[in-house]
C-alpha cells in the first residue's frame, strides 16, 4: 500500500510540476520578445565537469580542444567541476587562454569547483564541509553564482548537502541567484529514469521545492536531455546501448526573479564534446540589464 501511495503521489507531483513548467515556457517566449531592448544584454552561462582536471592538467590535447571549444562558444561565465590538480593561479592561466581574465577556485586539493568570467567577479564565500566537493559563491554581473559538486556515492549525503545549500541561499537572502554543477542526482522530469529509483529524485526535488527553476528542462527536448556519460569512457557501450545508459546529472537552476530572463538552454551533447570529458556541458542564455 505504501508503494502504491508513493507511485500515485509521485504522478500527482509530476503532473503539477509539468503544468507549471508548461506555463513557464509560454512566459519565457513572451519575455524573449519583450526584452529586445537597448538597455539589456544577452549573456551565456555554461557549467562543465572536466573529468579529473584533464588528468590533473597533464592531458594537453584535451586542454587544447577544450580551450578551442570554449572560445567558440564564448560564454560570459563558465563554471567548472573536477579541477583536480589546479591552484587558483593555474585556473587563471587556463581562463586567460579562452578570454576570461577573472577566475576563482573553492579549494586547491581533491575535486575543486571553480568559476571564470569575462567580467570582474567577487568571491563571497568558499564553503567546504557539508557541501560535497565544495560550494563556491561569487558575485558576477550583480548576480550570485553558486557552483557545487555533490557527493557521487551516497544519496543521503547528497540530500543533506542539498538541504545545506537551500539553507545557505535562504539565510543569505540570495534572490538573484544561479546554482549549477554536477549534482549526481536525477530530476523527476526525466521520465527515462523510472519510478524504481524514486529516492534519487530527492536532491533535485529539494531544489525545486525551494523555487529553484531547472532551465534545461524548460528548453531542452526529452531525447536530448542527457549529460553523462560521453563516449570517452572505455567502458561506454555504443549506439542504442549507450543511449540507454545516458542520464542527466548536471544542472543550472535560477531563482524566481531570474526565471523570466532566461531565453534558451542547451546540453552540448554532440560530437564536439564526445571526447573532452565524461560529462557533457550544460548552458543557458538570459537577458540582464546592461551595466
Language model features with spans:
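Surface-exposed cleft-lining segments at the edges of enzyme active sites
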Residues: 54-55, 148-158, 187-193
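Stable alpha-helical elements in mature extracytoplasmic
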Residues: 62-66, 87-91, 158-165, 199-203
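Bacterial N-terminal signal peptides
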Residues: 10-21
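Active-site beta-strand/loop signature of hydrolases that rely on acidic residues for catalysis
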Residues: 43-50, 66-88, 145, 165-194, ...
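Metal-dependent phosphoester-hydrolase catalytic domains
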Residues: 27-34, 126-127, 170-174, 188-291
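N-terminal, active-site-proximal structural segment of metallo-dependent hydrolase catalytic domains
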Residues: 2, 6-9, 23-94, 290
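Short, solvent-exposed loop/turn elements at domain surfaces
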Residues: 52-58, 79-80, 155, 216, ...
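Structured beta-strand-rich core segments of catalytic domains in phosphoester-bond hydrolases
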Residues: 80-154
Amino acid at each position: 500500500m505504501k508503494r502504491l501511495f508513493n507511485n500515485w503521489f509521485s504522478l500527482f507531483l509530476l503532473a503539477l510540476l509539468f503544468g507549471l513548467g508548461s506555463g513557464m515556457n509560454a512566459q519565457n517566449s513572451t519575455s524573449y520578445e519583450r526584452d529586445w531592448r537597448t538597455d539589456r544584454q544577452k549573456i551565456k552561462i555554461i557549467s562543465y565537469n572536466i573529468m579529473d582536471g584533464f588528468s590533473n592538467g597533464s592531458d594537453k590535447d584535451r586542454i587544447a580542444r577544450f580551450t578551442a571549444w570554449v572560445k567558440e562558444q564564448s560564454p560570459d561565465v563558465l563554471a567548472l567541476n573536477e579541477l583536480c590538480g589546479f591552484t587558483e593561479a593555474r585556473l587563471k592561466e587556463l581562463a586567460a587562454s579562452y578570454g576570461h581574465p577573472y577566475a576563482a577556485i573553492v579549494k586547491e586539493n581533491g575535486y575543486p569547483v571553480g568559476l571564470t568570467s569575462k567580467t570582474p567577479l567577487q568571491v563571497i564565500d568558499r564553503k567546504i564541509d557539508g557541501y560535497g566537493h565544495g560550494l563556491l559563491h561569487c558575485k558576477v554581473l550583480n548576480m550570485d553564482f553558486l557552483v557545487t559538486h555533490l557527493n557521487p556515492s551516497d544519496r543521503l549525503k547528497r540530500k543533506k548537502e542539498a538541504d545545506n545549500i537551500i539553507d545557505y541561499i535562504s539565510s543569505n537572502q540570495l534572490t538573484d541567484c544561479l546554482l549549477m554543477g554536477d549534482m549526481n542526482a536525477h530530476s523527476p522530469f526525466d521520465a527515462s529514469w523510472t519510478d524504481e529509483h524514486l529516492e534519487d529524485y530527492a536532491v533535485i526535488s529539494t531544489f525545486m521545492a525551494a523555487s529553484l527553476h531547472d532551465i534545461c528542462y524548460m528548453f531542452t527536448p526529452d531525447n536530448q536531455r542527457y549529460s553523462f556519460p560521453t563516449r570517452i569512457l572505455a567502458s561506454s557501450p555504443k549506439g542504442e546501448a549507450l543511449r540507454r545508459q545516458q542520464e542527466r546529472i548536471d544542472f543550472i537552476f535560477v531563482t524566481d526573479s531570474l526565471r523570466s530572463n532566461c531565453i534558451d538552454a542547451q546540453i552540448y551533447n554532440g560530437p564536439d564534446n564526445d571526447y573532452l570529458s565524461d560529462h557533457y556541458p550544460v548552458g543557458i542564455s538570459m537577458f540582464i540589464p546592461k551595466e
